[in-house]
């Protein structure tokens, strides 16, 4: 029994031993114990085996770092320009979407991408590096841009769309970099008070998000604080439209929730996690899809409202937190803003030049003017031989600075600098280069506007000669005219009267407005400079003045002979013409300030302030004196402006023309001056300061052609007695008009002197008639003699007669 039991129990004993020995055998490896675990593992193996099978494909390497506490960074004007201007322009371009995030070789099925491209780079990484102050110098950032474009050209075929897109972006990049500040300067950074709180919120938001596709997160949007945040938001960037401007309520809600987290692209927000689809490089670029980031823990706000905030917030926050904005001065768009200078006003020609400069810097011409906005940065553009070839660089910003600093004395210096800029471009670049074509286009704009330069810089602000000319200058001009007269004493009296009138007018203007006096002083200095230039230019042909002097002397001799021959005939006419002299009083009322006093300046300015030489209806009856001495028929260029003496002489000569000739004068003025075409030809007032130089020259030629024929008549045909009497009476009328004007102008609103002058005229008319022809000839020989000089010469001649 026991034997049976024992052998029988051995079998179970073995099994029991095995079961009882489970503990000891578990410590040692045994097949039985591991089989269940192997079966269990085998049961799960189909699911687990799929994971390493998917991981056999090459994984994307970690993206480039966007912040490094060990690597020093800083904020410079060039880096800020690259961030605010260059990156902003590239980011919103329609071809920028493939470059906004690192290349996902797994999703795009590019297994060899990271074998060929050893240093990946994208605009999102560059942008985040700029936001995190990762770069020490702008050259590092520019190198990243170049790496990104070079990677695209290396990996893709030249005919691929992505290559054309990269070329377009690179061209825009180079255009913007050309306008970058030339010298790199570090900027002072101010740290906002609440930056730590925002950083804590950002860390909390970032820590609550997990992702299978880890990318570095963006630090706080405050431009100054650097953070190394924990894991980030998994997002996929899609095409987005250009974000609109953020309203203030949205900004407030965003600030209360903390800064939004951005993808590797930093500005364009991405879809929620539910929509994770890769974007291939050659996707449709015409239908952008606006998406937004829904950050866990942030308040519930519409995705559409978060999207523009995420895209626009960093630059807006930086601008609001940074009162100093040096790069704004370097932007091409801000170059049009005219900064008022405190260094005095520009002349008329330089104002025109300043307008040309503004147009060259305007957005209208920016497409082909941008290479000339800033000095050529030879080191940044790799033009190592530029300064060897171009000895005098020039650009529009330098021209603008010189204009604001009043470094240009005249328009010629301004034009020389602009043309130097274009010639430098033509000299350095080959003729078929794009920048040469742009330079030619911009130069066409410049030359077209420069050709419209005002002929006379002082014409737009006409001034009465008595106030505009300083006494010394007026005196010198009067002396030059007195040298041409036949009577020295009469010319001295004329100068004294001129100076008295000028002093009266100057005192009135200075008492009325001090600013106007200051302006007049400036214009007087400019006028002196112009006269000096004209004198220097006109001294080229020296032979002509000598001829004029010889002709003057000959004509003086002829006049003297005429005086002797006519003396007897004048006395015969004394009786019949005695009752006629009182008429000038009526004639003066009809003609106003017309007739023009020889002592009152080139355009017949009266002391009372009336400017202009009137050609009234009654003045058409006046007969002219003979040709004035000292003014010969010298041909002048139409464009050359008239001097003070020439205008004065022309005013006197027009008053000498007979009635039948004045119609032609009016016709010339109306034909050449559009503003006077509708005026009444019966009575037209001429202001020589407003007439074009070409009009004045045409009038001068016509007047000279009329007066040149007069001296020849006495030699060929003797005038009958009747004609001589008519000429005598009209000449006397003209002299009395001059005298009345002088007296009324000096006393200015007093009526007694004109009456005295009339009484004196009536009392001495009998004596003056006898010698009127002699006075007429003397007045014709002295074109600039005044009324007082005429009357004095008349009385002296009557005494001698």
From Swiss-Prot:
Outcome after substituting residue 383 to A: Reduced binding to histone H4 acetylated at 'Lys-12' (H4K12ac)
Residues recorded with modification Phosphoserine: 37, 298, 301, 305, 633
Gene: BRD2
Compositionally skewed regions (Basic residues) per UniProt: 544-566
Subcellular localization: Nucleus; Chromosome
Function: Chromatin reader protein that specifically recognizes and binds histone H4 acetylated at 'Lys-5' and 'Lys-12' (H4K5ac and H4K12ac, respectively), thereby controlling gene expression and remodeling chromatin structures. Recruits transcription factors and coactivators to target gene sites, and activates RNA polymerase II machinery for transcriptional elongation.
Domain Bromo: 74-180, 344-453
Main location: nucleus
PTM annotation (N-acetylmethionine): residues: 1
Effect of residue 429 to A: Abolished binding to histone H4 acetylated at 'Lys-12' (H4K12ac)
GO BP of this protein: chromatin looping; chromatin remodeling; neural tube closure; nucleosome assembly; positive regulation of T-helper 17 cell lineage commitment; protein localization to chromatin; regulation of transcription by RNA polymerase II; spermatogenesis
GO MF terms, alphabetically ordered: acetylation-dependent protein binding; chromatin binding; histone binding; histone H3K14ac reader activity; histone H4K12ac reader activity; histone H4K5ac reader activity; protein serine/threonine kinase activity
Chain ranges for the short sequence motif Nuclear localization signal as given in the UniProt record: 555-559
Bias (Acidic residues): 481-514
Assembly notes: Homodimer. Interacts with E2F1. Interacts with (acetylated) STAT3; promoting STAT3 recruitment to chromatin. Interacts with CTCF; promoting BRD2 recruitment to chromatin. (Microbial infection) Interacts with herpes virus 8 protein LANA1.
Effect of residue 170 to A: Loss of homodimerization
Name of the protein: Bromodomain-containing protein 2
Family: Belongs to the BET family.
Region (Disordered): 53-73, 268-349, 456-647, 737-801
S-S bonds: none
Domain of life: Eukaryota
Compositional bias of kind Gly residues: 592-612
Record-level GO cellular component terms: chromatin; cytoplasm; nuclear speck; nucleoplasm; nucleus
Residue ranges with Low complexity bias: 285-298, 763-795
Modified residue annotations for Phosphothreonine: 6
